[in-house]
Amino acid sequence: LVGSEMCIRDSEVSGYSEPSESEHDFFVIGHTSTSVSLASGLAKARDLKGETGNVIAVIGDGSLSGGEAFEGLNVGAELGTNFIVIVNDNQMSIAENHGGLYRNLQQLRETEGQAPCNYFKAMGYDYLYVKDGNDVEQLIEAFREVKDKKHPVVVHINTLKGKGYKLAEEQKERFHYSVPFDLETGNLTGEPGKGEDYADLTAGYLLQEMKKDPTVVGLSLIHISEPTRRRGIS
């Protein structure tokens, strides 16, 4: 397991949802693919209590391949009440997306949501496509259209990752997260730590072992730092 370069200190806010930090965090969750299943549970609880209001799950296209996302979509489709799933489709994932779902997302983008094959409709959701998800006015119009629906709906928004910041548009993975950097150049600021970090040490060890034994496989919890280092290990 290769560690991340970004370590959270005890005095800082945690990277994910944490109920002990905020009354608005209902669950302790991990990295990805959790939003739809959690939201479907919240929507069911709302209905059982006879309450009203919108329950909205936001998920990126990269997270849709997770098994928990499929389970959540499956359950949510049968709710029969207001349940909104927003798919932020920016065609970017740290590990490149592959599979039938992503072929269908591409078909939907290319036809502006009109493709005869529609994964979400097949599951029982209403479906609304937003051509430019970086256009705030288009988003407002779409959300107004779906907020009072009495059954599950998917809002599929096509977005550009890093929109408005040229460096982030061109280097999507580099700016997926970052330590402090210079806004003009993109160069990292601050003094780097002395010596090798955990990721460097682990990567170096794995490379040595792989040279001796081609059957060695490296497993990463999320991703292995910069793309060049990751390709060197994979």
What are these regions (language model features)?
Residues D10, E21-F181, N187-G195, A199-G204:
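Glycine-rich ThDP/TPP pyrophosphate-binding loop and its adjacent helix/strand module
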Residues S4-E5, R9-S17, E23:
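Active-site-proximal gating segment of KS-fold condensing enzymes and close homologs
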Residues L201-P214, L219-S220:
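Accessory "access/gating" subregions that flank catalytic or transport cores
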Residues D132, L221-I222:
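Structural motif
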Residues E5, P19-S20, H156-N158, S220-L221:
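Short coil/turn segments at secondary-structure boundaries
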Residues L1-G3, C7-I8, I222-S234:
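Single conserved hydrophobic/aromatic residue that forms the stacking wall/gate
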Residues D135, K212-D213, E226:
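Polar helix-capping/helix-linker motif
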